[in-house]
Amino acid sequence: MSWSLLPTFVYNPFTMQSSFTHSSKPPHETTVVVAMSGGVDSSVAAALLVEQGYNCIGVMMRLWAEMGEGEGSTNKCCSLESVHDARRVAEELGIPFYLINVEEPFKQNVVDFFIDGYSRGVTPNPCLECNRHIRFDYLLNYARRLGADYLATGHYARLRRGDDGKVHLLKGVDENKDQSYVLSVLGQAELEDVLFPIGDHPKAEVRRIAAERGLPVASKHDSMDLCFIFDDDYRRFLHTWAADAM
């Protein structure tokens, strides 16, 4: 099977030039909603798109608002610090920024799924459900309602169109960061309308790009565990939210 590039970011480390190799419209006529988290990956995704002249809108989802005791003990995905960082990056890039509340659908489709899995003695993967129901359903439809042409995220994955005319999901070039598995729930309707600008980059290069562009999150640590459990204590979370189910 032969492949043709979709609108995926291509980076030349020698000339520092970059381009999207396919688009039905020129960048300045193309609107992209960028899912921002306040982390380095989504921030660099936004920066690369802005540099190419795309009309970007930064959107951050308020997914969960569990609070713990002590300073800084909020869940990682929606902490005030993360919101502040995402807003700072958007201001630095000169793009609009919106924070939208999706707590109810997130609880129904992700948190309840997580609790149900543990109550049945299986290990759930809530990231798959989040991508299926929240990022690439709720947020993608939100982007479409805004009139955007694409939704971009900071996932380490790539897209290619085969000679069968279908969009195929490929691994990111950084095997240690590849996220194609958690995106495997996406169908053609979603893959046609999404972009993964950093999928062709190793993580170290993404951090270098962030530092070179002066993004305020360039040295921010990655979030490795479930974003909605602020202290990574599964037992405490399940006892708090699912005592009757356990």
Question: Which role does the model predict for each range below?
Answer:
Residues 6:
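Acidic, metal/ion-coordinating pockets
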